[in-house]
């Protein structure tokens, strides 16, 4: 399959030819996720799941990215980003794209997913479809399970418009009549607590054993008049407001955890950035809501269905409508030995999640917690959860008298509250808990175990590209390296010293680490490939990351391509530049081959290095925040067999994908990869599932 894209020269394009707006690039990624919902290669319930993922993704996009641009616009910022757009222009483009995408999302739901589910006897019944017996059951359910937890709020001078929680389901009700106090009430708001399920399954005896469900919104809509005795509800309309959820935290505070706790509550009531209403909501009602939330019609989204598809989930009992479950395999090296420590002493061990099990990582900690020869355990935690097995094992180790040090990043977005709880659990167990470096998020993924062996201290290290989160390790692809390499272990030790103590930058032997050496060394590696290409030697760079937005590296990749280096990019969601193919195709010997796939999380950097390839795995994407504002670890893969595995399975395999990959075009748009004439179908992730059976 020929997907090469010829690069451009720096003198032949303006900045907006070279760069893609970051917000629009992220939105493009979400649109590619939405396209999975119409892909016939996916089973039906997996397609439905992609619709829900799209909703969750879009929620966060508005909460963080759109909210940030709105703040720039509100402050009168008219400066242009590298792509040439002002904040106002970005907001307009987002609105146009998002409105069209959401309309398409609900059309897919109503015209494709729900009808096909009905063919499988999975139904979401509308109010008019209920039988008398089902209606009676729903009424009883409302009276016993729903009404007691609802709080209807009339809107009058004594009851101003309530502060509604971010992304909560609410109903605005139009009324006729007078209440118990003789007041004429025209409007009321009914918030639906998050504790209520959004989908209610009817009993089997009322459905003939079929999976019939009723939306909570339909139940409330049908019986909303019961909440206003003596009055008549003439209309009931769902709505949902999305708010700015980014946290503004002063880095100079004395107690980061305490300050963060104080800020978390504000996230629920930040400035409104989007209003969703149902299509049947009258104009005078949504205009009233827009005024209350200080929004305009550009920020209004009318939807043909429930206003929150992200919670449209249920435990459907249809295995044939889902992918077969995959049981992650345990590498053979662990099956040949009783101890993780003895396995790691024999060789470096590469784990490729979710195809290979995350269990060896947990087992390393468990053995360390219970081994009398283990003296200390040190670990970074970014997203884990207080109830995770890793946190529980670390707490056990501390209670067993081990010196446990946890470097917890409290500011991991949307996991702040959970991470505070993790810190409390570990502190109560006796662990030393630190929050990293003020002004820098700790994003490196590192474990170090110190063990006494033959009167010497031996270190065991795990380095990863993804979080220490067992559930995520079953969903996202990541690499982990388990090693006793003395230089790597010493480097990890020095980074932990940086994180917990004070002193100058640690000089490392093998690891590259941000914010100190990583960016500069990446530039050096690219320069070496440029020199090789100019000398007539084969030169190739492959970058597999979630995001590539750092301008210096982007410019250096352009330079490399112009020099004749083959540049292959595998980017999950955020890409800041375009290849320029539409204007400058065929003018240079170098090529760009840029593609994207969903649910990939590995960060791998490959430099051909004149036949002696360099392969690094890392916690860092190629973004300003990772390279300059975070503590990151980038580790070399040196074992020839492991290098071959990563190159073939983690890089070349994805470059050959012609089913799930999307290819970047010269105008910044993406097209779905298609097999060339006579070319075999190739799905990279499916190939790995087959490999690791």
Swiss-Prot record:
An MF annotation (GO) of this entry = ATP binding
**SUPFAM superfamilies membership:** Phospholipase D/nuclease (SSF56024), PHP14-like (SSF143724), PPK N-terminal domain-like (SSF140356)
Which residues take part in binding ATP?
57, 476, 572, 601
Keyword annotations for this protein, in alphabetical order, are: ATP-binding, Kinase, Magnesium, Metal-binding, Nucleotide-binding, Phosphoprotein, Transferase
Q: Which residues bind Mg(2+)?
A: 383, 413
Enzyme Commission (EC) number = 2.7.4.1
Q: Name one Pfam family in it.
A: PP_kinase_C
| Catalytic residue positions | 443 (phosphohistidine intermediate)
Give the free-text PTM comment from the record. An intermediate of this reaction is the autophosphorylated ppk in which a phosphate is covalently linked to a histidine residue through a N-P bond.
Q: What does this protein do?
A: Catalyzes the reversible transfer of the terminal phosphate of ATP to form a long-chain polyphosphate (polyP).
Return the similarity comment. Belongs to the polyphosphate kinase 1 (PPK1) family.
Q: What is this protein called?
A: Polyphosphate kinase
Source organism of this protein record: Acinetobacter baumannii (strain ATCC 17978 / DSM 105126 / CIP 53.77 / LMG 1025 / NCDC KC755 / 5377)
